[in-house]
């Protein structure tokens, strides 16, 4: 099979904005998704609502990674949409300063510049519960424990060394 990204480059497609995901037979998939047979494929950039959601989720992922590196004991909560952004609550045991925000922004830019790949991990739900429990992500643990699903998938940045997970 070929990844959606390979197909995109193979057809030399040109979008005015970076492609962030695709619909395969009308189902949203990441660009690492492998296609094995003939499929209807629609590549998406940020002009599409699904593409914009993918882009925003990836930025939240980068934010979580930056915060976890700069404030290992900190807790970040992405709570709800506000205007054209999201309300976030960062708890690091003291008031957040402008310098903290600047450091987070700088680290996010560095992470983006590293061009780290997102990897989809599929495993037994019990394994995912263990992974999220070790990282103190108790809200995800509770959700998975009551999901009734035998298998779960999650995404990670980097398979080796430091990884950040999101459900």
Which residues does each PLM region occupy?
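Ubiquitin-like/PB1-type beta-grasp interaction modules and other compact soluble beta-rich domains
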Residues: 1-60, 64-83, 103-110
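Non-catalytic interaction/regulatory segments
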Residues: 82, 91-167
